Amino acid sequence: MTKFIFVTGGVVSSIGKGIVAASLGRLLKSRGYSVSILKLDPYINVDPGTMSPYQHGEVFVTADGAETDLDLGHYERFTDTPMSRLNSVTTGSIYQAVINKERRGDYNGGTVQVIPHITAEIRDRIHRVAQDTHPDVVITEIGGTVGDIESLPFLEAIRQFRKDVGRRDLAYIHVTLVPWIPSAGEMKTKPTQHSVKELRSIGIQPDILVCRCDRPLQAGMKEKMSEFCNVSPEAVITSQDASSIYEVPLMLEREGLAEQVLDILQLEQRQPDLTQWQRWVHQLQNPSRRVEVAIVGKYVRLNDAYLSVSESLRHAAASADADLQLRWVDAEDLENGDPATYLDGVDGIVVPGGFGARGVDGKVAAIQFARDHQIPFLGLCLGMQAAVIDWARNVAGLDGANSAEFDPETPHPVIALLPEQQDVVDLGGTMRLGLCPCKIQSGSLAQRLYGEDIIYERHRHRYEFNNAYRSLFLESGYCVSGTSPDSRLVEIVERPDHPFFIACQFHPEFVSRPNHPHPLFQGLIKAALGSDLTLVDPAPLPAETV
């Protein structure tokens, strides 16, 4: 029978609930328990697909094509378990479902209310995750902060959930802040006490407190919070700031978080096997060399907009025994200045995805710089499209070449709208999304990196390489090394006369894992370090549901 864990947050936002939930998932999985993690987001958007990266950060795409919160990326990377659209729920999607039911007459003329109808829909979504994959444990993270108006229906739903499954099959974890007050020279528990008081006023008594702090809790503080918050001293868990998020599972293991959870849920206490994770963290913390990679993007003022990209580079660098240094470069700066000012000295360049014309010419300039100076280059989604635009303008001599997305009147639309997108009106959830197969050309760099003839990768785009220019592209020395199985859609392009120049239409960053660095990122880092690419051992990618 599935057990349920609910993770709430108090005192401040961005307190790290997602990392705590993901870390707990890793600790339970290391004990042989299967885990699925669900995120409840209180915003009214149906999904984050149309939200600005500056508002929301990265949009993480699941294998089944859901556009979700970046926390699902943490869940997948920490647990090495693919999530689905069932693992992402927003207030908007809940209200949309309830209103659709009302329009169909499912409520038999009754008055539709937050309680019981909205809360019942929320509970049903949680049950659905358990029914879909039958995990041993479902961990649910509730977005927002206790006390927010937006979160109240979710909190009420998880309070009611106790009646659905019984007290022995459910645990509440509250992540809170214990700040250090410099003027007083001590840490304060009062914010935690008030946060728990707010939670208890809703009818939820936390079983475990996870206390975020920048230093070890002072003597007697666990006992004090235990007494005031009505939890056992052993259930007051310290979560001290770490140099890397990947240290957090090991820190929480030392604090006994998993043991407390298993006790509450009356599950068997098993010995964890964290050997692989410990080895990975040791690699991360003890590199013998250094590599610097530039990420040239249009949303670099918020690094979370490219979270999976930076983490994928980190996975690959650690596996190559290298300390990763990231140089964040605003693509717009390259439109008005000399690219060398921003890119000189880097070992590799990544141009990630994005939408809209702003900064695209800067991305093209970065790619031309990488091509001219033989710097290892990896393009992702829009990064591939920008590489094609660079080829068209600067190699093939097609004046005015562009993407039809940015210039509908361009004389050379080397990037064009997918045929199936021609009549699409709505923006949300209508792109080419999720896992798609890709056929790899024998003897190509892509084939050397993947070690496979057919791969599956996640997509999020409306525009593709215009096949009217494919022959000219090939004649000018470039290679189309990956296509859809019917050869209609160009998925990977390369420049064979370059040490490492490869770009893909998909998003490989969504399937990179600490223990399985993605082959494209692994290849980039190897090339950036000057290593022989023949030594790249094709890493098996996580199993996906095709």
UniProtKB/Swiss-Prot annotation:
Disulfide bonds: none annotated. Keywords: ATP-binding, Glutamine amidotransferase, Ligase, Magnesium, Metal-binding, Nucleotide-binding, Pyrimidine biosynthesis. Its EC number is 6.3.4.2. InterPro entries: Class_I_gatase-like, CTP_synthase, CTP_synthase_N, GATASE, GATase1_CTP_Synthase, P-loop_NTPase. ATP binds at S14, I15, G16, K17, G18, I19, D71. One of its GO terms (cellular component) is cytosol. The keyword Lipid biosynthesis does not apply. One of its GO terms (molecular function) is metal ion binding. The active site is at C381 (nucleophile), H507, E509. L-glutamine binds at Y54, G354, L382, G383, M384, Q385, E405, R462. It catalyses: UTP + L-glutamine + ATP + H2O = CTP + L-glutamate + ADP + phosphate + 2 H(+); L-glutamine + H2O = L-glutamate + NH4(+); UTP + NH4(+) + ATP = CTP + ADP + phosphate + 2 H(+). Residues 292-534 form the Glutamine amidotransferase type-1 domain. CTP binds at S13, D148, I149, E150, K188, T189, K190, P191, T192, Q193, K224. The keyword Transmembrane does not apply. Allosterically activated by GTP, when glutamine is the substrate; GTP has no effect on the reaction when ammonia is the substrate. The allosteric effector GTP functions by stabilizing the protein conformation that binds the tetrahedral intermediate(s) formed during glutamine hydrolysis. Inhibited by the product CTP, via allosteric rather than competitive inhibition. UTP binds at S13, K188, T189, K190, P191, T192, Q193, K224. Mg(2+) binds at D71, E141. CTPSs have evolved a hybrid strategy for distinguishing between UTP and CTP. The overlapping regions of the product feedback inhibitory and substrate sites recognize a common feature in both compounds, the triphosphate moiety. To differentiate isosteric substrate and product pyrimidine rings, an additional pocket far from the expected kinase/ligase catalytic site, specifically recognizes the cytosine and ribose portions of the product inhibitor. Catalyzes the ATP-dependent amination of UTP to CTP with either L-glutamine or ammonia as the source of nitrogen. Regulates intracellular CTP levels through interactions with the four ribonucleotide triphosphates. Homotetramer. This is CTP synthase. It comes from Synechococcus sp. (strain ATCC 27144 / PCC 6301 / SAUG 1402/1) (Anacystis nidulans). The lineage of its organism: Bacteria, Bacillati, Cyanobacteriota, Cyanophyceae, Synechococcales. The gene is pyrG.
